[in-house]
Regions:
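Catalytic center-proximal scaffold of phosphoryl-transfer enzymes
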Residues: 1-141
């Protein structure tokens, strides 16, 4: 998993305090081992930051829709459900009753069901293999 978030650094040499910098986060997958979370500070959001950090990485990379991750060779991008849900929620008109015929509302409700299912599975099982098996059983139904 990868994500980047803006931040301001005060008293950084040769940069104004209002200048936007970025903290990049890289997290290992849920493969049964202990999670590894690494952070990288950068003055920019350039996709080369991800390329440099993930040099030699091959596999699935869960991230948001930022195009900078497209530069990472040998990475198969996967979307983050929380980001997709946020995009759908942003597309729903505010201050009005939900229109259940709208794709954005239907998508948000479907993702809510996925999140609920994941909570149920994780409350019952703690090992990666058991969680994976339960997910696959639910998928086949």
């Amino acid at each position: 998993m990868a994500d980047e978030t803006p931040l301001q650094v005060l008293h950084e040499p040769e940069r104004r305090a209002q200048t936007k910098s970025y903290m990049w986060l890289f997290r290992s997958g849920e493969d049964g081992g202990p999670p590894i979370i690494l952070y990288k500070y950068s003055e920019t959001r350039a996709g080369d930051n991800a390329v440099d950090f993930l040099h030699g990485f091959k596999g699935y990379l869960m991230c948001d829709g930022y195009s900078g991750y497209n530069k990472v060779p040998d990475a198969k991008r996967t979307a983050c459900w929380a980001h997709i849900r946020r995009y759908l929620t942003d597309a729903i008109p505010k201050g009005k009753a939900l229109d259940y015929t709208q794709p954005s509302v239907q998508g948000m409700l479907y993702i809510n069901q996925l999140f609920h299912l994941e909570d149920v599975i994780r409350s019952k099982y703690s090992s990666f293999d058991a969680i994976k098996k339960a997910r696959l059983e639910k998928k086949s139904r």
